[in-house]
Amino acid sequence: MNKLTTIESHFLQQQKLYPEINSEVTGLLNDVAFAAKLVRREVVRAGLADILGLAGSTNVQGEEVKKLDLFANERLINAIGQHGRFAIMGSEENEETITPPKFESGEYVLLFDPLDGSSNIDVNVSVGTIFSIYRLKSDNPSQASIEDCLQKGADQVAAGYVIYGSSVMLVYTTGHGVHGFTFDQTVGEFLLSHENITTPEHGKYYSVNEGSWNEFHDGTKLFLDYLKEEDKATGRPYSTRYIGSFVADFHRNLLTGGVFIYPATKKHKNGKLRLMYEANPMAFICEQAGGRATDGHRRILDIEPVELHQRTPLYIGSKNDVLIAEEFEQDKR
C-alpha cells in the first residue's frame, strides 16, 4: 500500500473502480474531510482558545451543550454546505432540519453528529465526528423536507467518522469496503493508512457502561456475565474497555475485535443513542468491515425511522459476539 496516497487521490481511484461513486459523491466526501480539518484544528487547541466548558444552553436531546459542540456544528454546516451538494441537513445539535447555503442544486442529504463524546473534551479524551449521506428523494431540492432525512440506514450512499485522538483519523465507506486515513499535519492532508479494514469475527473486548447495571434487563446482564466467564475454547473472559466516547470505543473494537453495547434500560426503554446520527452510519461501516449491528432484535440498517432524533438500543461489533448478544436479548440462551 502506498503510504502517500492522499484522500483525494483515493476518492478518484474509487470513482474509476465503481461507477456509482460519481464526482458528486467524491466531492461530498472531500467536503467532509475539509470540515474535519477545521474541527481538528480547534479540538487540539481547545484549552487555549476558550472553547472548553459549557455554552450555557441545552440541545434538542436535553443535554448541556459544550462550547466546542457549537463550534463544530457551525463549522460543519458552513464548510460542507457552501458547495451546493446538499439540499438538506440534520444535526444532532439542531431540533429541526437545516437548509444549507446554495441548497438549490443539492442532490444529497447529510446527517451528522458534530462532536460525539464532547463531555470528555475537557479532560483530553478522544472525541469524534460522525456523518451519514443519503440521496435526496424529492425531485426538487427546494422541496426537500424531513421525509428526505427519514430513510433506512440501508439506503446510505456513504458514512464515516473522524476520531480526534493521539492522531486524527477519518474512516469511511461507500459500500465498497472500509478505508481509514490518518491526518499528517506536516503536509495538511489525510493519507491512506488503513486500507480495506476488516474486523475480527470474535473479539476480546466488550464496551458498556456497567454503572447502569441496575437499569439493565435480565438478557443484558446474562450476556455480560457470559463474557466474564472463563472458557478458553471461546476466548473468554473478555476484558472491559469503555472510554465513554462512542467513536473511540467503536474505533478500537473495529480494529481489534469486540462488542459495544448501549442497551435498552428500565430508564431508557428505546435506548439512548441516536439512530440517524450514530447507529446508522456506524452500522454501515461495521457491516462493510464484516461485523454486525442490531438493536437486539432487528438489523439496525433495516429500521424504518419515524423521527429525526429517534433513539435505539445498539449492539455493534464483531459478528459472532453480536449474534450471541442477540440470543441473550431474545431469551434463546
Swiss-Prot record:
GO terms for cellular component: cytosol. It is found in: Cytoplasm. Binds 2 magnesium ions per subunit. Its main location: cytoplasm. It catalyses: beta-D-fructose 1,6-bisphosphate + H2O = beta-D-fructose 6-phosphate + phosphate. Belongs to the FBPase class 1 family. This is Fructose-1,6-bisphosphatase class 1. It comes from Chlorobaculum parvum (strain DSM 263 / NCIMB 8327) (Chlorobium vibrioforme subsp. thiosulfatophilum).
